[in-house]
Design a protein with these regions (language model features):
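ABC ATPase nucleotide-binding domains
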Residues: 234-267
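ABC-family P-loop ATPase nucleotide-binding domain
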Residues: 1-19, 254-267
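Compositionally biased, low-structure terminal segments
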Residues: 8, 23, 31-34, 214, ...
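Residue-level preference for well-ordered alpha-helical positions
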Residues: 110, 128, 233-234, 246
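ABC transporter nucleotide-binding domains
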Residues: 13, 20-200, 205-211, 215-219, ...
Length: 267
C-alpha cells in the first residue's frame, strides 16, 4: 500500500492491555482505549507517567512487553511497516540529521515514504509557505545551524509530508513562537476535520483544553480518566483542566511544597 492510499477505518488507534516493562519497573501498565477518525485527543500525565513510552510503542520505536495495539487496523508487531506508513510522529526531542540542509532532509523523508520528487517538492513548498520559512535557508543552511523553532517546523513538515491518517505530537509547540503556535493549532484542527486521528501530548494544559475534544490522563503508567475535557472538569468539580490534572496526579502536594520552600527566602 502506497503512502497516499486511503485507509478506510473507524478506529484509527486501538490499545488492549498495552504494557511496557523495563526490568522490574513497569512504565506502562495495562492501557486500553480507542481513538476514532477525526478526534484530537490530549494524552496527558506528569513527568515519568509513561506518556512518551506509550507513544514510542505506538510509533514502533519500542516493543510492548504485553498487550496489543493496532494503528488503522495494522498490528504493531505483525505489520510494522504498514504502521509506519500510516503515522506521522513529532517527537519531543525533535532530532534531525544536522549534517543535512532542511531541504535535503525533507526530500530524504519523502523518498523514504516513496513520494515522487515531483509530488514531494510542491508539498514541501506548501509547508514552507505555511510556516513562513525561507527556501534559500532550507536549501543552503545545515539543520545543525537552525534555531529550535525552525527545526521544529521542519520536523512537523516531515511528519505530515506523506499525508498520514494518524499523527502523534509530543510537545509540538516547543520552540515555536506565538504566531506559529496559533497557526499550528488551526492546522491540527483542520487535519482532524479531514478525518485524521490526532494524539496531542503536552504540559500546556490550557491549550489542550481549547484544542482537544477528548483527554486521556495517565499516571504511573495507569489510565486515570478518559473523556471530554468539559465533562471531566464538571464531574470532578475542578473548574479547569489544570486543576483536575493536579488533583488527580498529586500536583497539590507539590504546590504546597513549593509555597513552603519559597517562604524560606523571606527575610
Amino acid at each position: 500500500m502506497g503512502p497516499d492510499s486511503p485507509l478506510a477505518c473507524t478506529s484509527m488507534i486501538s490499545l488492549r492491555h498495552l504494557t511496557k516493562r523495563f526490568g522490574s519497573q513497569t512504565a506502562v501498565h495495562d492501557l486500553s482505549f480507542d481513538i476514532a477518525a477525526g478526534e484530537i485527543v490530549g494524552f496527558l500525565g506528569p513527568n515519568g507517567a509513561g506518556k512518551t513510552t506509550t507513544l514510542k510503542m505506538l510509533t514502533g520505536v519500542l516493543e510492548p512487553s504485553a498487550g496489543t495495539a493496532t494503528i488503522c487496523g495494522f498490528d504493531l508487531l505483525t505489520s510494522p511497516m504498514d504502521v509506519k506508513r500510516s503515522i506521522g510522529y513529532v517527537p519531543e526531542s525533535g532530532a534531525v540529521y544536522e549534517s543535512l540542509s532542511g531541504l535535503e532532509y525533507l526530500e530524504m523523508i519523502g523518498a523514504l515514504y516513496g513520494i515522487a520528487p515531483a509530488v514531494a517538492r510542491p508539498r514541501i513548498e506548501q509547508f514552507i509557505s505555511f510556516f513562513d520559512l525561507s527556501m534559500d535557508t532550507l536549501r543552503s543552511k545545515l539543520l545543525g545551524g537552525y534555531s529550535k523553532g525552525m527545526r521544529r517546523k521542519v520536523v512537523i513538515t516531515a511528519a505530515l509530508l506523506h499525508n498520514p491518517p494518524v499523527v502523534f505530537f509530543d510537545e509540538p509547540l516547543e520552540g515555536l513562537d506565538a504566531n506559529a503556535s496559533v497557526g499550528f493549532k488551526t492546522l491540527i484542527q483542520t487535519l482532524a476535520k479531514e478525518g485524521k486521528a490526532i494524539v496531542y501530548s503536552s504540559h500546556i494544559l490550557d491549550v489542550v483544553e481549547r484544542v482537544c475534544d477528548r483527554v486521556i490522563i495517565i499516571d504511573k503508567g495507569k489510565l486515570l480518566v478518559d473523556g471530554a475535557p468539559d465533562e471531566l472538569v464538571a464531574e470532578h468539580n475542578s473548574g479547569t483542566l489544570e486543576k483536575l490534572f493536579t488533583d488527580l496526579t498529586g500536583g497539590r502536594e507539590l504546590e504546597a511544597r513549593a509555597e513552603a520552600f519559597a517562604k524560606t527566602f523571606l527575610p
